[in-house]
Amino acid sequence: MGSLQRMAVLCGLTVLLASTAAQAEDWKVAKNEDGIKVSLSEVAGSDYKAYQGVTLMKTTIAKLRALQEDVSGACTWIHECKTQKLLKHEGDQSWTYTQFNTPWPVTARDSVLHVTTIEGADGSLTRKLEGVPKYLPEEKGFVRVTKVDGFWKFVPKGDQVEVTYQVHTEPGGSIPPMVANKFVVDAPFNTLKALKARAEK
């Protein structure tokens, strides 16, 4: 990738991250345990809140990247992940398919993500998450998640890494408010806790 193209990608990502942040600015802490802080924000025009989880891990960005790029293996630490596979990998971009467990009586969900990885000049790593529901035909027995907008960000802090996981999802179909409200706290907290356990081994 040429320097101009790389600059264009970086600028584009900055705009995308800024738009995500603009949609969800008024963060309120919902849970702060085990060194993991989960905050929620209303998103204009959506019935579902955005979530943000932040924690410090005694690990390296290289190890975190390896754990994330092992797409099928990552299912063991992603909250309520049933199965996950890599559909396509091309340079700094990849496409993944995930099936999720859901509590009865909610129909199981699946999602297709376009992941763009950007290495920052400061040693940070950002993985932009974008839902692409039409990338694959819908699977029988699953409701396709209609929108995913978020990112992972890893920032070196001495011998630790600050990890931020922020997402806003439109899950498709109908979800009881009690289930949705529980998910937006459990998803970042449990995902970060499980990732931390593996990253710090």
Locate the predicted segments by residue.
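Repetitive helical segments and hydrophobic/amphipathic motifs
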Residues: 14-15
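N-terminal signal peptide c-region/cleavage motif recognized by signal peptidases
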Residues: 19-21
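Bacterial N-terminal signal peptides that target proteins for export
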Residues: 1-11
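Eukaryotic helix-grip
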Residues: 23-201
